[in-house]
Amino acid sequence: MSNESNDLEKNISHLDPTGVDNAYIPPEQPETKHSRFNIDRDTLRNHFIAAVGEFCGTFMFLWCAYVICNVANHDVALTTEPEGSHPGQLIMIALGFGFSVMFSIWCFWWGFEPSRFSLFVFGQSHLSSQMCSDVVSSDHCWDGCWWCR
Protein backbone atom coordinates (compact mmCIF):
# COMPACT_ATOMS: atom_id res chain seq x y z
CA MET A 1 0.00 0.00 0.00
CA SER A 2 2.87 2.41 0.72
CA ASN A 3 4.32 1.85 -2.76
CA GLU A 4 1.01 2.76 -4.33
CA SER A 5 0.73 5.96 -2.26
CA ASN A 6 4.30 7.02 -3.15
CA ASP A 7 3.59 6.47 -6.83
CA LEU A 8 0.37 8.45 -6.50
CA GLU A 9 2.18 11.31 -4.75
CA LYS A 10 4.82 11.41 -7.49
CA ASN A 11 2.14 11.52 -10.17
CA ILE A 12 0.15 14.35 -8.58
CA SER A 13 3.01 16.38 -7.06
CA HIS A 14 2.78 18.97 -9.84
CA LEU A 15 -0.94 19.57 -9.26
CA ASP A 16 -2.08 22.42 -7.03
CA PRO A 17 -4.83 21.82 -4.42
CA THR A 18 -7.57 22.59 -6.95
CA GLY A 19 -6.26 19.86 -9.28
CA VAL A 20 -4.89 22.23 -11.95
CA ASP A 21 -1.68 21.12 -13.64
CA ASN A 22 1.11 23.64 -12.83
CA ALA A 23 4.01 21.76 -14.36
CA TYR A 24 6.18 23.89 -16.65
CA ILE A 25 6.22 22.51 -20.12
CA PRO A 26 8.75 24.33 -22.31
CA PRO A 27 7.35 25.47 -25.62
CA GLU A 28 8.45 23.41 -28.54
CA GLN A 29 10.63 25.45 -30.82
CA PRO A 30 11.10 24.07 -34.27
CA GLU A 31 14.74 23.44 -35.04
CA THR A 32 15.51 25.50 -38.10
CA LYS A 33 18.45 25.11 -40.37
CA HIS A 34 20.33 28.09 -38.92
CA SER A 35 19.05 28.25 -35.34
CA ARG A 36 22.02 26.27 -34.11
CA PHE A 37 24.38 29.05 -35.15
CA ASN A 38 22.07 31.97 -34.22
CA ILE A 39 21.94 33.29 -37.78
CA ASP A 40 18.82 35.23 -38.69
CA ARG A 41 17.57 36.50 -42.04
CA ASP A 42 19.19 39.92 -41.70
CA THR A 43 22.60 38.38 -41.05
CA LEU A 44 22.30 36.18 -44.12
CA ARG A 45 21.13 39.16 -46.17
CA ASN A 46 24.09 41.28 -45.03
CA HIS A 47 26.54 38.51 -45.86
CA PHE A 48 24.94 38.08 -49.27
CA ILE A 49 25.19 41.82 -49.99
CA ALA A 50 28.84 41.85 -48.92
CA ALA A 51 29.62 38.80 -51.05
CA VAL A 52 27.98 40.35 -54.12
CA GLY A 53 29.90 43.59 -53.58
CA GLU A 54 33.19 41.75 -53.22
CA PHE A 55 32.47 39.73 -56.34
CA CYS A 56 31.64 42.82 -58.40
CA GLY A 57 34.73 44.71 -57.27
CA THR A 58 37.06 41.77 -57.79
CA PHE A 59 35.53 40.95 -61.17
CA MET A 60 35.89 44.55 -62.32
CA PHE A 61 39.55 44.67 -61.24
CA LEU A 62 40.48 41.34 -62.82
CA TRP A 63 38.51 41.93 -66.02
CA CYS A 64 40.22 45.26 -66.67
CA ALA A 65 43.63 43.68 -66.04
CA TYR A 66 42.75 40.73 -68.30
CA VAL A 67 41.80 43.02 -71.16
CA ILE A 68 45.07 44.96 -70.85
CA CYS A 69 47.09 41.71 -70.77
CA ASN A 70 45.38 40.46 -73.92
CA VAL A 71 46.02 43.74 -75.71
CA ALA A 72 49.68 43.68 -74.65
CA ASN A 73 50.22 40.06 -75.68
CA HIS A 74 48.52 40.41 -79.08
CA ASP A 75 50.31 43.53 -80.25
CA VAL A 76 51.16 43.12 -83.94
CA ALA A 77 54.35 45.19 -83.72
CA LEU A 78 55.84 42.88 -81.08
CA THR A 79 55.16 39.55 -82.80
CA THR A 80 58.57 39.49 -84.53
CA GLU A 81 60.41 39.23 -81.21
CA PRO A 82 61.96 35.89 -80.26
CA GLU A 83 60.49 33.85 -77.43
CA GLY A 84 60.08 35.72 -74.20
CA SER A 85 58.48 38.96 -73.17
CA HIS A 86 59.29 42.32 -74.61
CA PRO A 87 59.93 45.07 -72.03
CA GLY A 88 57.15 47.12 -73.62
CA GLN A 89 54.69 44.30 -72.97
CA LEU A 90 55.75 44.04 -69.33
CA ILE A 91 55.41 47.78 -68.84
CA MET A 92 51.98 47.79 -70.48
CA ILE A 93 50.80 44.87 -68.31
CA ALA A 94 52.10 46.57 -65.15
CA LEU A 95 50.39 49.83 -66.10
CA GLY A 96 47.24 47.88 -66.96
CA PHE A 97 47.06 46.35 -63.49
CA GLY A 98 47.75 49.76 -61.94
CA PHE A 99 45.03 51.45 -63.96
CA SER A 100 42.69 48.57 -63.18
CA VAL A 101 43.15 49.18 -59.46
CA MET A 102 42.79 52.93 -60.00
CA PHE A 103 39.55 52.44 -61.94
CA SER A 104 38.13 50.14 -59.24
CA ILE A 105 39.06 52.61 -56.52
CA TRP A 106 37.50 55.47 -58.48
CA CYS A 107 34.26 53.49 -58.91
CA PHE A 108 34.03 52.78 -55.19
CA TRP A 109 34.49 56.33 -53.85
CA TRP A 110 38.26 56.16 -53.43
CA GLY A 111 37.96 53.32 -50.96
CA PHE A 112 38.58 49.93 -52.54
CA GLU A 113 36.12 48.00 -50.42
CA PRO A 114 33.13 46.98 -52.49
CA SER A 115 31.47 45.17 -49.59
CA ARG A 116 31.32 48.37 -47.52
CA PHE A 117 29.99 50.26 -50.52
CA SER A 118 27.27 47.71 -51.17
CA LEU A 119 26.24 47.72 -47.50
CA PHE A 120 25.93 51.50 -47.72
CA VAL A 121 23.90 51.36 -50.95
CA PHE A 122 21.42 48.90 -49.44
CA GLY A 123 21.02 50.97 -46.25
CA GLN A 124 22.83 48.61 -43.89
CA SER A 125 25.55 51.15 -43.05
CA HIS A 126 25.49 54.92 -42.51
CA LEU A 127 27.54 57.56 -44.31
CA SER A 128 29.23 58.64 -41.07
CA SER A 129 30.52 55.13 -40.42
CA GLN A 130 31.74 54.97 -44.04
CA MET A 131 33.68 58.19 -43.65
CA CYS A 132 35.14 57.22 -40.27
CA SER A 133 36.25 53.84 -41.54
CA ASP A 134 37.83 55.44 -44.62
CA VAL A 135 39.82 57.85 -42.47
CA VAL A 136 40.93 55.13 -40.07
CA SER A 137 41.87 52.67 -42.80
CA SER A 138 43.75 55.14 -45.00
CA ASP A 139 47.53 54.87 -45.13
CA HIS A 140 48.10 58.58 -45.41
CA CYS A 141 46.41 61.80 -44.39
CA TRP A 142 46.35 65.30 -45.80
CA ASP A 143 49.16 67.73 -44.99
CA GLY A 144 48.85 69.33 -41.60
CA CYS A 145 46.87 66.51 -40.03
CA TRP A 146 47.39 66.47 -36.26
CA TRP A 147 47.38 62.68 -36.27
CA CYS A 148 50.35 62.33 -38.67
CA ARG A 149 52.67 64.83 -36.95
From Swiss-Prot:
InterPro entries: Aquaporin-like
Keyword set, alphabetical order: Cell membrane, Endoplasmic reticulum, Membrane, Repeat, Transmembrane, Transmembrane helix, Transport
UniProt main location, coarse: endoplasmic reticulum
Compartment list: Endoplasmic reticulum membrane; Cell membrane
Residues covered by region (Disordered): 1-35
Extracellular side: 69-89
Inducing or repressing factors: During exponential phase in rich medium and repressed in minimum medium, hyper-osmolar medium or in sporulating conditions.
Lipid bilayer topology: Multi-pass membrane protein
Transmembrane segments: 48-68, 90-110
SUPFAM superfamilies for the chain: Aquaporin-like
Gene3D superfamilies: Glycerol uptake facilitator protein
Cytoplasmic side: 1-47, 111-149
GO cellular component terms attached to this protein's record: endoplasmic reticulum membrane; plasma membrane
Domain-related comment: Aquaporins contain two tandem repeats each containing three membrane-spanning domains and a pore-forming loop with the signature motif Asn-Pro-Ala (NPA).
Family of the protein in this entry: Belongs to the MIP/aquaporin (TC 1.A.8) family.
Task performed by this protein: Water channel required to facilitate the transport of water across membranes. Involved in freeze tolerance, osmotolerance and cell flocculation in liquid cultures. Is non-functional in most laboratory strains.
Name of the featured protein: Aquaporin-like protein 2
Originating species: Saccharomyces cerevisiae (strain RM11-1a)
